């Protein structure tokens, strides 16, 4: 029996997968990567910037996170490479405190992010730009992954955040928590048609030395996407 090749991945999505991360979740839990002969281990981190930093520090081999951090590192001269893309849109809602009922009221709000430069930051900046609100009119706060952002929203110590659709639905089902969805998935897609999205990325050195592993990783993602489409 051939031994599976090991590969270490950092999950910028944190310890859990959301709707945005369905392809990665499917590849992991449906055994798509295992079928390609890979032994994948995940390390959860807070955001795409941390995921790429883990790659550059040789803590992991491949990052899963937003496109933005990879492009930024590449523009700064870091030897990074994108392997495969996940999707072309984010399954998120803009959740706000109950008192914020119009888009004009977003000026001056505190807005929770995974971290500065993370996918949630990139998408939030695009939303603000589309609404013709200056970035300096927002109190940006790096809070952490969705559970931490939701906790801050519920505590009333933050005004606004982009939250996964399934988590937003759970919040909306509780009429007494003081929160509501200001912009849903379809409205955000109309507002920002071209959205940042998740990618798998690595270093140029790893790409040169481990092409077989990366080919298998990509084929596993294709398997997962087809399985989701067929379901």
Model-based region annotation:
Residues 150-153:
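Rossmann-fold dinucleotide-binding core
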Residues 148, 158-231:
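Pocket-lining segment of extracytoplasmic ligand-binding domains
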């Amino acid at each position: 029996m051939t031994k599976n090749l090991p590969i270490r991945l950092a999950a910028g999505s944190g310890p859990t997968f959301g709707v945005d991360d369905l392809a990665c979740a499917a590849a992991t839990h449906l055994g798509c990567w295992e079928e390609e002969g890979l032994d994948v281990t995940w390390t959860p981190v807070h955001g795409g910037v941390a995921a790429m930093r883990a790659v550059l520090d040789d803590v992991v081999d491949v990052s899963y996170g937003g496109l933005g951090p990879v492009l930024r590192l590449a523009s700064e001269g870091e030897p990074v490479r994108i392997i495969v893309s996940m999707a072309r849109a984010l399954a998120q809602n803009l959740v706000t405190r109950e008192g914020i009922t119009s888009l004009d009221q977003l000026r001056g709000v505190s807005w929770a992010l995974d971290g500065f430069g993370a996918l949630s930051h990139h998408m939030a900046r695009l939303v603000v730009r589309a609404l013709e609100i200056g970035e300096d009119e927002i109190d940006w706060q790096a809070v952490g992954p969705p559970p931490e952002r939701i906790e801050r929203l519920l505590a009333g110590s933050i005004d606004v955040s982009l939250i996964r659709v399934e988590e937003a639905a759970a919040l909306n089902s509780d009429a007494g928590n003081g929160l509501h969805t200001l912009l849903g998935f379809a409205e955000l897609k109309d507002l920002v048609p071209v959205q940042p999205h998740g990618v798998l990325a690595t270093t140029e050195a790893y790409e040169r030395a481990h092409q077989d592993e990366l080919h298998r990783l990509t084929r596993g993602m294709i398997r997962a996407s087809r399985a989701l489409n067929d379901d």
